[in-house]
Amino acid sequence: MRSKRKPIAIAILVVIAWFGVTGFFGPLFGKLTSVQENDNSAFLPDSAESTKAVKLLESFAAGESTAFPTLVLLEGSVGPEVLQQINAHLETVPDLKLGGTDVPLSKYLLPGSRVTAFPAADGKAVLASILLDGAAIAEVLPNDEPVLPAIVEALREDFTPFAKDLGFDSYVTGAGGLIGDLFGAFGDLDSTLLLTTLGVVAFILIIVYRSPILWFLPLLSAVFALSTAGGIIYLLAKNDVIDVNGQSQGILSVLVLGAGTDYALLLISRYREELHHHSTPVAAMRAAYKGTFEPIVASGATVALGLLVLLLSDLSGNRGLGPIGAIGVAVAVITMVTLLPAFLVLFGRWIFWPRIPRFDDVDAQLTGTWAKVGNLVERRPRRAWIITGLLLVVLAGFSTTLKTDGLSSSESFTGNPESVVGQKLLLNHFPGGEGDPTKVILKNELIPAVSEKLRGVEGVTAVAPEANAAGVIVKDGLSILNVTLSTAPDSRESRDRIPAIRDAVKSVDESILVGGTTAVFFDTDVAARHDNRTVIPVVLLLITLILGLLLRSIVSAVLLLGTVVLSYFATLGVCALVFNHIFGFAGADASFPLFAFIFLVALGIDYNIFLMTRVREESGKMGTRKGVIKGLMVTGSVITSAGIVLAATFGVLGILPLVFLAELGFAVAFGVLLDTIIVRSILVPALVHEIGPKVWWPSKLSKSAD
């Protein structure tokens, strides 16, 4: 009797321990937004020229800070009297209160700066440049809300009625407006994204299990995992160990809930199968645990290690996602191999009601749809892998048309927030770079020579040294040239001019630095392309080693990796067609191929690990060719369900008004479905059946009779 009670007692202790852990970390997860860093310049390595420029620019500003321009565009007929009214109103801007607090906007203005307006040459618009303190706006308000979106909201609430009274339209735009709207989009992560993801997962689990009760246990376990991982990440970010931005927080939520639910599905499926062969839930769980622990841990390790390779990235945002995702996946694995088994053992067989698996019942997994698929592959394996392989190759051919040369801030939104509309209207009245010029830091005596060189660069509309009432500002023998471009500072056209600007100034003096918003965007694209070249080969090597060790076979490791990489390029091909011709996106971020690769290859390998570990187990009993068909039959339903869950969770990213996350969500959702329905269900089993026992070379299994 005591031996029977011991597993139950252990299960109770595990559940109590998890409630304690989540009770501590859960509330901290709610604060994760307050430690986000969404400024592009903060993501660049110290070696980037624009980063060096930022550090030098800080020494020019009073209070050791950098100017962060926020623009207010007022459209209407401008006369002397109206301009006077606008300037008078601008004097009240420093007194605006932020985010429902008593904190005035003046606290975040660049010391010594004045808020003034100047009219457009066409007399149809006025532009006010509000210079914010770049260091101060990185703080949070007393209510833990980020400062910048609160400033943007306060300016809009103030200027909208004022402009209306004048018969004008107002738009808060520029770097401050665009990033403020970016923060606003990420602000939905805590509520809209999380609740939608939970709802989607719950809906799919109810359909999969056809039980009014069972779905709750894996979902609750996944929520415990997310809360715990989020709390750990908050503590690390608060202590400056890792960088968190809105994208990485959103990806964390869908990754933990999606991957965690996948692992839960695998365990529950095997547990249900074993309940047909064991008289007690404890005995069934022991057998299920033995059969699923290795593939779950191996799958989690593959994803986590693949994400950790992002630590090799130049971009700190990518480096931050590495440990963030790895922590999330690791906690998800730990939760699903500890908390979920404890829940299942405590609730017993009845948790599967109304489809309760009975001892000695026939397991339905060996009949039905997946038995038919298995029989089809078994009858004509060569035709199966040739047709599916050719389909993937054709789709992969379109991957060369995917545009990954980066997005401007205005192209980064799926809709048209006020900052994007304002940025477009700004170009009708002012040079695109007005209010946010490219910064050239140089020795004071070189100003005439460098200015002459810059005026000869295509797209440069104005060159002027930074000055105050006393004249040109000089700090330690250095000055700043403000270079105004004809196009928006974050546009591809402006970015493409940075090399020419740098070549022009360095022809005078190699020590001259070019910085500012446009240079930051250009250097970010360069760093992203470096990350693509560096990280992807390392991930491929790492995954090959993990597969080889897990399956004890070089042939199967290379085979699986090859099919998943082919699936990745096929997905990129479909993305190119959809993004260009259906969604109408301007392109994709330079980091998109890397993010898509990390998730598609690492998560795609997951399903092949689930399949092939079971195939190896069955091959030892009945031979490779029969074993692969049996493995496909018994894992088909659960792996497809897992793929649907993961696709749905990443697809939820599409509800956010951000092009990068919408594109990533589509890519992962489509790629995972392609992998589960085509690659893992037909291509891999057909190839294994064709190759036979040699697929396990050099292990002993390769020499067994088939």
Please state what every model-predicted region is.
Residues 1-37, 135, 140-404, 509, ...:
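Membrane-embedded transmembrane helical bundles of large multi-pass transporters/channels
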